[in-house]
Amino acid sequence: MTPFLAEITDKIIKENPDFSNTIWVFPSKRAGVFAANYLKKNNSKTIFAPEFLSIEAFITRLAVIEPASTETSLCLLYESYLETGIKDKESFSSFIGWGTTILQDFNEIDRYGVTAKKLYTHIQNLQEVSHWALEEDKTEMVKAYLKFWEILPELYERFTKKMLAQGIGHQGLLYKKAKENIAQFLIDLPATTFYFIGFNALNTSESDIIQYILSEKRGSIFWDLDQYFLENPLHEAGYFMRKHLKNWPYFQESKPEGVSNRYTSTEKKVNIYGVPKSVSQAQLIGEILNEFSQEQVLNTAIVLGDEELLNPVIHAIPNGLKANITMGAPLSGVPMAALVA
């Protein structure tokens, strides 16, 4: 079976052998690395390689501001909070608890193109109704609670201005600025063609940016989806693609590219092993990898259902086998953590 990225790379080579003015955008950096390897294998000529970007890197380039760390964002958010009309300001240590949640909310507001003032006004009105009572006077606690919702649009505006003044932004703000800048970006790069490869679910800003590029006939998009999931209206895996097909004007004239029929046409082999305890599971993984050829190892993914298995599996991987690990793990599970405990 030909891998998805190899298939798409080969298709692009045939359609556009000149990569000097192309940008390939992927959901992750890792996908770009694999695509680059397939490009080298499938192309025998000496060429200028295209530019490979993750969607985050592409958005950052469009936004023309730098990503801000969570710590910096929280500090600027607290400064903005101190400038609002709330009388009894909380200390920074108390603020961090709910400030992190507000930061996440602001991030989602910008990523999905929501108007903060309208959103928080609606929420404030709902809170007013939920705390309505026959008594004319509200308690001081209720007044403070309602005041908090009232100042959130102001907090959002102050916070956004502070970030832009420093040329930085949280992820949502990067998406917002990228969407604003996309038209000028295409004008500045009149000869560049864009390929979006391996996407499925998109947030509102990503969807609008890609649709604009497609509407200007400046690129193509290749979806990582199987026909089986697309045609089954009850299957969650095809939900977003069915939504795109229904809502995107682009699909009124064009068919989705990249959609395959691998799921039903490819023979599947499933081996089930009954193994007790975490260490035994990790050891079994090591034994199976020992039986694989180098080529099989390069095309193998180990998906763990529990992050606690990560350390045992790392120790069970055969010597000399290079593993690319992308998985979060608590610092408490690192041996060095004992030094600072």
What name fits each language-model region?
Residues 1-341:
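Nucleic acid-machinery interaction/catalytic patches
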